[in-house]
């Protein structure tokens, strides 16, 4: 048990990462349909191409300022927004040199690759999937649609001028919050 292995509590980021992305078990990694009318929720790019068209219009204004440009999409879902955005950017003569997709879920990454290879094969050489966020700066844009709530994050709170990390424990057959002393790195990042 992960919580027992971590002395009775795990960071919320680890809990969230396990719940969402654990291979074969996590919400985004268990293979069931999540997006669209047959899934649990629908995002704007799946309803209409208008969202991506509007985004492409704004992106083209920014990308045109760079000799070499890139877009980094964080959490590309089914890949529909990436597909439509690249098609619209090409129509605006603003196709980026690179289109990076940072995707944690191997299942979603596979779906994105299948969709994009089948639907826009002429752009596939522009698309690069990343397993980690780039350490070097990109010249261009970072975009994310309906993804912030699916990123594993640490939780913290301030009590009596001290930062506490809010962790997850398991007690009486239920998950519970527990406040722990925050690691110095977390405190430094908050200051």
Residue ranges, per PLM feature:
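Rossmann-like AdoMet
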Residues: 1-74, 78-132, 136-138, 156
């Amino acid at each position: 048990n992960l919580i027992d292995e971590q002395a009775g509590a795990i960071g919320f980021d680890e809990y969230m990462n396990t719940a969402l992305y654990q291979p074969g078990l996590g919400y985004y990694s268990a293979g069931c349909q999540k997006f669209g009318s047959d899934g649990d929720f629908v995002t704007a790019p799946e309803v209409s191409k208008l969202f991506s068209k509007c985004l492409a219009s704004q992106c083209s204004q920014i990308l045109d300022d760079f000799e070499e440009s890139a877009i980094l999409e964080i959490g590309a879902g089914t890949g529909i927004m990436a597909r439509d955005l690249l098609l619209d950017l090409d129509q605006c003569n603003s196709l980026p040199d690179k289109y990076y997709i940072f995707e944690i879920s191997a299942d979603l990454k596979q779906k994105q690759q299948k969709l994009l290879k089948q639907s826009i094969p002429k752009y596939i050489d522009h698309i690069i999937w990343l397993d980690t966020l780039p350490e070097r700066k990109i010249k261009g844009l970072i975009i994310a649609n309906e993804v912030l709530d699916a990123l594993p994050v640490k939780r913290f709170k301030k009590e009596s001028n001290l930062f506490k990390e809010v962790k997850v424990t398991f007690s009486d057959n239920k998950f519970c919050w527990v406040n722990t002393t925050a690691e110095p790195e977390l405190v430094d990042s908050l200051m």
